Regions:
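Bacterial N-terminal signal peptides that target proteins for export
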Residues: 1-10
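Flexible loop/hinge segments at secondary-structure junctions
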Residues: 23-248
Length: 248
């Protein structure tokens, strides 16, 4: 029985490979014909991965190396942590990338579907707030200022930078962030607004952080948050904003 997992670790692929190898050995003990069939099956095998965009960069790197070393194909999708768990608990994927632990309701869904899994923490990441490179007035930002931008009460009301801080220009504020199925969205809203999933809804969303990068890069008044790894990959095109306790 293939044991599924909720997070990806380099060693995880070794576990999966060992299971496939064990099947081949079993077939070899039966007869050569069955062994040949098993090997052909391994060559055509596909490991399906989905979930968090934050974990995507690590997963994609390991997947590429794994495919070079084996004949097993690996597909890596980005549906967000929540969206990925829905697929995982329906048995549509083999590995679930997550930027948070599995929720109780997701445990129940997996149990009902007969999905067994192991959870493997692989890394710690931090969220990064970025703006357009042409933004020449923002050297830092406070949690309160971010809250004023992102809280539900800001929807349809806070439309310019000056409305957040009078010292800032009257430039249109364009926000980019993770979708509601994302673990990143849950974490950011809880840390900044004070309650998970509590956010204005009139901003551009994407489960793929590359889309957020492109959005901020193309809009002078843009601001976004996403995993630090995506900032590192795109730091030549973006400006990172330190979060401070007091404005100044």
């Amino acid at each position: 029985m293939l044991v599924k997992t909720s997070k990806l670790l380099g060693a995880l692929f070794i576990v999966v490979a060992s299971i496939l190898s064990a099947c081949s050995k079993s077939d070899n003990s039966a007869n050569n014909k069955q062994s040949k069939t098993a090997n052909t099956s391994s060559e055509n095998a596909i490991i399906k991965i989905d979930g968090s965009s934050t974990v995507y960069t690590i997963t994609e790197t390991v997947a590429e190396e794994f495919q070079l070393a084996t004949k097993v194909n690996v597909t890596v999708g980005i549906s967000g942590t929540g969206g990925g768990f829905k697929k995982f608990c329906r048995g549509e994927t083999d590995i679930q990338n997550a930027s948070r632990p599995i929720l109780e309701k997701e445990m129940v869904a997996c149990k009902r579907a007969g999905i067994e899994y192991i959870e493997l923490p692989i890394a710690y990441d931090s969220l990064t707030v970025v703006v357009n490179q042409r933004n020449n007035f923002l050297s830092s930002i406070t949690v309160e200022e971010l809250k004023k931008m992102w809280e539900p009460a800001a929807q349809g009301v806070i439309k310019t930078w000056a409305q957040v801080n009078p010292a800032w220009p009257n430039t249109p504020l364009k926000l980019f962030g993770a979708g509601s199925d994302s673990g990143t969205f849950n974490y950011f809203t809880k840390a900044i607004v004070g309650k998970a999933k509590s956010s204005r809804g009139d901003f551009t969303t994407s489960e793929d952080d590359n889309g957020l990068v492109q959005g901020v890069q193309s809009d002078k008044g843009g601001l976004a948050y996403f995993g630090y790894a995506y900032y590192v990959e795109n730091q030549a095109r973006l400006k990172v904003v330190p979060i401070v306790a007091v404005a100044g």
